[in-house]
A protein has these predicted regions:
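Conserved "landmark" site that anchors the functional core of diverse proteins
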Residues: 1-297
Length: 297
């Protein structure tokens, strides 16, 4: 491989290539995939002069390290973490010029879960269905990165831009998830619906890019049995037989047979990407009509 590229020297727990995903293919059984914390992904790209659609690296908890073949501007956003270039401290949430052959390391997250690493030109792997995103459910796109993997970089799009927003540090002490009830809320008793709105839930360690699983009280069902498989949207709150809701994230299955008690609007999903296991979760019912004027979650 010739031209600009990076080599993964430390892949971390889970590092994947992500962009804005591949929407519009659910009828083929293909989920959207893409960056779970889209605002952080977009900001990282902006800081290095890329469009928001350029591919970045999404790290999970332990970060990653890369060696660049040619001098490259890199930015790390999302979950705050220590950033170094050849062992010397570098800023997080700002463009960093990395000399040819140098190693930039994004260390373990100090708050939150997922960091985003953008390079000038974006990750240039081959698109699949119009996207470079790794889809861990269907297996589309690049595999999760391993030590020694070499990734091409695209041509620069323009000079790095000044940041006009402070990188979001992730959720606070509680993850607040507004949801619109339905379409299968009638499958649950009034007590089950109250439990969802008032119960004390926490993020489960079994959560992943497919869904945020919860620990806490079980939601009481009014009906037995299961549904025929039906379409599952991004943000669906599906309730499996154990009664504990699962929030479907970007690699979710496009169909399922467990009832969906509500749907979390997409604009509220980014904080879920940064919620570490054990984070308290509060579900807040809201009306379907009319956009929210203010989001405090």
């Amino acid at each position: 491989m010739t031209g600009p590229a990076l080599t993964v020297v430390r892949a971390g727990a889970l590092t994947t290539v992500q962009d804005l995903g591949r929407p519009g293919h659910a009828h083929l059984g293909v989920p959207r995939a893409g960056a779970l914390d889209e605002p952080a992904h977009r900001l990282a790209n902006r800081l290095v002069g890329n469009p928001g659609s350029a591919a970045t690296l999404e790290t999970t908890l332990t970060g990653c390290g890369i060696r660049v073949r040619t001098a490259t501007t890199v930015a790390v956003t999302g979950a705050p973490c220590p950033v170094t270039v050849d062992g010397r401290p570098a800023p997080w949430g700002a463009p960093v010029r990395v000399p040819a052959g140098a190693v930039l390391d994004a260390g373990p997250a100090t708050h939150g879960l997922r960091s985003y690493l953008a390079c000038t030109g974006g990750i240039g792997t081959e698109p699949v269905l119009g996207s470079r995103a790794a889809d861990l459910l269907s297996g589309l796109g690049p595999d999760p990165l391993t030590d020694g993997a070499v990734l091409p970089l695209g041509p620069p799009h323009g000079p790095p831009a000044d940041a006009d927003a402070v990188p979001h540090p992730g959720p606070g002490t509680e993850l607040v998830l507004p949801f619109v009830p339905g379409p299968r809320h009638t499958w649950f008793t009034d007590h089950g619906l109250r439990t969802l709105a008032t119960g004390r839930f926490r993020v489960s360690a079994a959560s992943n890019r497919i869904g945020l699983r919860t620990e806490g009280p079980s939601l009481e069902r009014a009906r037995t049995g299961e549904l025929p498989s039906e379409g599952m949207p991004l943000g669906a709150l599906q309730v499996p037989p154990d009664g504990r809701p699962v929030l479907f994230l970007h690699d979710h299955p496009t169909t399922g047979g467990y009832p969906v008690i509500g749907v979390v609007p997409e604009r509220f999903l980014a904080p879920a990407a940064q919620a570490v296991p054990g984070t308290p979760v509060r579900f807040v019912p809201r009306r379907a009509a009319g956009p929210s004027r203010r989001h405090t979650g």
